[in-house]
Every structure is written in C-alpha cells, then in structure tokens.
Design a protein with these regions (language model features):
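Single conserved hydrophobic/aromatic residue that forms the stacking wall/gate
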Residues: 1-13, 271-278
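Flexible, glycine- and charge-enriched loops at secondary-structure boundaries
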Residues: 2, 158-165, 221, 225
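Generic structural signal for beta-strand residues in well-ordered domains
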Residues: 2-5, 85, 181, 238
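Non-catalytic, usually N-terminal nucleic-acid engagement modules in DNA/RNA processing proteins
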Residues: 10-181
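Glycine-rich phosphate/ribose-binding loops and adjacent secondary-structure elements
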Residues: 178, 182-272
Length: 278
C-alpha cells in the first residue's frame, strides 16, 4: 500500500530540508507537516473532539502505557477500538509505551525478553514484551503504531546507550514479526542517545522495517536544544524519502519550526494543552 506521497514546498524550503506530503490512513488523509495533540488517556485534556476538529486537528496521539493500565486495552477493544471509545473518526497514533515504562514505572528490570515493572497506579507487577506491546496496540486499534523501544536518558554513557539501541533493534524485529494487522502502519523508532554513530546504525538497521514511516525517539530528554538540533542536522539526508518522519515528544513552537526545517513531518507534545487546564 502506498501510504505517503510527498509534495514540493519550493526552493527555499527544499534548501532547508522542509517538505510537505500526504499520509494515507484508513480514517482519512493527513497533510504534513502536522502537529498531533496528545490525548494520553484517549482524551485531549480540556478539549472536546468536536473542538479539535474545529481548530483543524488531523490526528491525535494516545498513550499505550496509560491505556493499558486503565481502562485496559481489552476493554477498549470491546468498545469498538479507540475511535469509537473516544468519539474520534479521524486518524489516531499510539506510542508503544516504552518511554513511560522506563520513566514512570518504578523498579523496572530490563531484559532482552522484555521489561518487568511495577505499575505507577497500584504497584502491581507487569511484564511487557515486544509481542505484548504490539498485541496491546492491535487491541487499541490506532491507524499508526510504534514499535517497542528502550529510550536512554540524556547523560547515559556510550556503553549503556549502545546496549539500549541494540536492544531496540532486536525488539523491532520481534514487533514486526508479531504485527499482523494490515490496517495499522508500524513505525520503527530510531534510538542512540546523543551519539551520532549509534543514531546512524539505528537508522540504517531500522529502514527495512520503515515501510510506512519512521520515528525519531530519545530526543528532548533533557539535552540542550542546540544538541538536539545538531543530531537532527546530522540525520537530515539519511532518512528514506518516501515515508513520513515522526519526531517523538517534541512540539513546542520553536522546536516544531526547527524540526520541520530539518525534514520532520510529524511532531507531538503535551505542553500545548496541559497549560490550558492548570
């Protein structure tokens, strides 16, 4: 299936790396570049679905970890999937829950098989494998889903960052094998922390799995913006041209503009809606 078609933006934008395109999903087309409002628990805080449509929102991001914790992916599936559950008939993207497992869950224990962690809600022990993460995302039923990954925090040394990147690649292979739903586009996630050689390896090994899109993870995790932009500059020109690029967790107005200038098609960020309910 041809998921993505690029469109020219003009010479000045081409020189900067920016581009425009259309991403096709079962719930409609998405014109890129695009910002995704974050509906962590299947709702964008303080905003009704009809209001999101009125302001032109094309796609919403929902969080796999939080929906798995409550109300549970099986319940969402029984309700007809996320689109019916949240009364949203446009495209939805779910992350894999990997970032939350490592950042929110207490006492997590990472193994090649998967991750043991205690729920931040009630403390119960859970075990998430790449296959389990895909099964949860299949149940949720989003149009675009992410592979399960290990995100290393800013300041992690080279050895740890390399191990996390290599584990992410192994998990990607397992995610791809487990994913059977042709109506959901699976994106691999590029990791490698702030080490350019690791980023390049991660991207190269992920491209065979990037049939419908690719995500850039592990940025905006505490590093100065100059370092983030430097990594993005380094990656520009190395991405496949025929699929969308999703910059995860980055979407403040200045970062959005800088990302688009560096060839990014899609961004998501919670802080544009959280201040409205403070």
């Amino acid at each position: 299936r041809d998921y993505y078609a690029s469109r020219g933006l003009g010479d000045v934008y081409k020189r900067q790396g920016a581009r425009a395109g259309v991403f096709h999903t079962p719930h409609g087309d998405i014109e890129t570049p695009v910002y995704m409002p974050v509906g962590t628990q299947a709702t964008v805080k303080g905003v009704l679905p009809r209001d999101l449509k009125e302001v032109g929102a094309q796609i919403i991001l929902a969080n796999t970890y939080h929906l798995y914790m409550r109300p549970g992916d099986e319940l969402v599936k029984a309700a007809g999937g996320l689109h019916k559950f949240m009364n949203w008939d446009r495209p939805i993207l779910t992350d894999s829950g990997g970032f939350q497992v490592f950042s929110l869950a207490k006492l997590n224990k990472i193994k090649d098989e998967g991750v043991y962690f205690n729920s931040h809600v009630d403390g119960r022990l859970h075990f998430i494998t790449p296959e389990k993460a895909i099964a949860i995302e299949n149940n949720l039923g989003a149009d675009i889903i992410m592979a399960f990954d290990q995100c290393s925090e800013y300041g992690a040394d080279y050895k740890f960052s390399k191990a996390a990147m290599e584990r992410t690649l192994k998990w990607l292979e397992r995610c791809a094998a487990a994913h059977k739903n042709e109506n959901q586009a699976l994106f691999p996630i590029v990791q490698g922390n702030m080490f350019k050689d690791l980023r390049e390896i991660s991207l190269k090994e992920s491209i065979p799995y990037a049939k419908h899109g690719i995500a850039i993870g592990g940025l905006s995790v505490g590093e100065p913006k100059e370092i983030m932009y430097d990594i993005m500059d380094f990656m520009l020109g190395k991405y496949p041209a025929d699929v969308p690029r999703y910059l995860m967790g980055v979407g403040s107005p200045d970062c959005l503009i800088e990302g688009v200038k560096r060839g990014i098609d899609t961004v998501s960020y919670t802080h544009l809606t959280l201040p409205t309910i403070a």
